Amino acid sequence: MKRVLTALAAALPFAAHAADAISGAVERQPTNWQAIIMFLIFVVFTLGITYWASKRVRSRSDYYTAGGNITGFQNGLAIAGDYMSAASFLGISALVFTSGYDGLIYSLGFLVGWPIILFLIAERLRNLGRYTFADVASYRLKQGPIRILSACGSLVVVALYLIAQMVGAGKLIELLFGLNYHIAVVLVGVLMMMYVLFGGMLATTWVQIIKAVLLLFGASFMAFMVMKHVGFSFNNLFTEAMAVHPKGTAIMSPGGLVQDPISALSLGLGLMFGTAGLPHILMRFFTVSDAREARKSVFYATGFMGYFYILTFIIGFGAIMLVGANPAYKDAAGALIGGNNMAAVHLANAVGGNLFLGFISAVAFATILAVVAGLTLAGASAVSHDLYANVFRKGATEREELKVSKITVLVLGVIAIILGVLFENQNIAFMVGLAFAIAASCNFPIILLSMYWSKLTTRGAMLGGWLGLLTAVVLMILGPTIWVQILGHEKAIFPYEYPALFSISVAFLGIWFFSATDNSAEGNREREQFRAQFIRSQTGFGVQQGRAH
């Protein structure tokens, strides 16, 4: 049986977070009717929520931010639902299954960005912005150039993420459900468009909340059954896992999947700052009523995600013990059926039988839908709010802006389906690494410095932001993943897998240098306006009305 090549998570954690990208050849599985029935129940229920939400979406604020009426707890669950992808579940547990302790290190890597969001970004972002993070970046800077840069940064991240999600969705569904790849991609695209088109942020939020609850329940049940098997003793769990794993005691120590310190540092910075620059995550902070609820959102989201990653660690060791040692889950060559990414799915069957296997498969599909819905809404708002209403057609009515947003949703949906089909047999795992690098090198520096550095000017933000974005793209192309593995050259021009360390440095240095040397009258005026922005960012004065651009 052909192996499913794991997502980049099998060796590199960027994809474990977000790609859901199972790249390579997939042998279609028999149709899993339990999974299909459970998934249909989920779809019918969420379409009902979309219909309910569509009756409550009456304005631009309702469509983009659910009217700002989501509570901190609900938003925390939704953020967790937006951030915990199917490959977080499958990829991290697969990494633990193959490498043990390394999987825990990487799962913690996905959490380190959240304290930055909590302490540095959440409160000021909510007090200064209205619908998108470009509202914050352009608060005292020149609207046109900054919004174009922010929208481009957002759209590139969204596009790369969407392609990775769509290809991963098709491969995953082909594997779990036995459905044809093209049918799976079209199904995800159509459902994604329906959620966002009719229900906006309100429907997207509730799809993400439901998915988060289902995923946390499923993972909790699996972890509980694993611990029950070993008498609720971690000592027994680790001892039994070491006894059956080919690496033996080596799974309890770091194995050095990232070989050199530069790559490790670059990877860590990309994960940490990339999270704080993802447009679909930042957009969620505008769905709550005030800065206090925004802080609570991050607090709850971090708690849910931390709990989830602890569960994946237990699930990974449970898979070593109950799946790795069971010949029923191996093919003729002795490899795991479906590849290592399927370790958690096989464990679901081992601890809960066919019915629970169907449930976990349906949850994996629901997870992809929740993530792509959030991405699509972020992309649509960048086009309609940042570009159309504030650059190309200033003074556009709410109705016109919403019309453009919905057209963008349709266009993004169709493009995502087409690219999902075209990239079926391509290695798309690098796209998520590139998305994170761009978010960390373009979006994050501009957001952070616009809120904290009084001497920032439009010239500095523009030149530094574009330099960061282009450096990330160029270094990724010249690196080992694209230059050698995809383009087929013998040796990479840029030797490191991850460009974040270098591209983030270029962005911050560029922003600092071009702002510090900007002696124009406009630059001086922008510096003087920082005090008013600072007061607004601290007090939230005027936040209910938002800033009229």
Curated annotation (Swiss-Prot):
The record's listing under InterPro entries reads: Cation/Ac_symporter_ActP (IPR014083), Na/Glc_symporter_sf (IPR038377), Na/solute_symporter (IPR001734), Na/solute_symporter_CS (IPR018212), Sodium:Solute_Symporter (IPR050277)
Its domain of life? Bacteria
Task: Output the GO biological process annotations, alphabetical, semicolon-separated.
Answer: plasma membrane acetate transport; sodium ion transport
Record-level GO cellular component terms: plasma membrane
Q: Name one GO molecular function term.
A: acetate transmembrane transporter activity
Q: Where in the cell is it found?
A: Cell inner membrane
> So where does this one cross the membrane?
33-55, 76-98, 103-125, 146-168, 183-205, 212-234, 261-283, 303-325, 359-381, 402-424, 428-450, 462-484, 494-516
Q: Which UniProt keywords apply?
A: Cell inner membrane, Cell membrane, Ion transport, Membrane, Sodium, Sodium transport, Symport, Transmembrane, Transmembrane helix, Transport
- Presence of the UniProt keyword RNA-binding in the record: no
Q: Which family does it belong to?
A: Belongs to the sodium:solute symporter (SSF) (TC 2.A.21) family.
| Entry protein name | Cation/acetate symporter ActP
User: What organism does the record attribute this protein to?
Assistant: Salmonella typhimurium (strain LT2 / SGSC1412 / ATCC 700720)
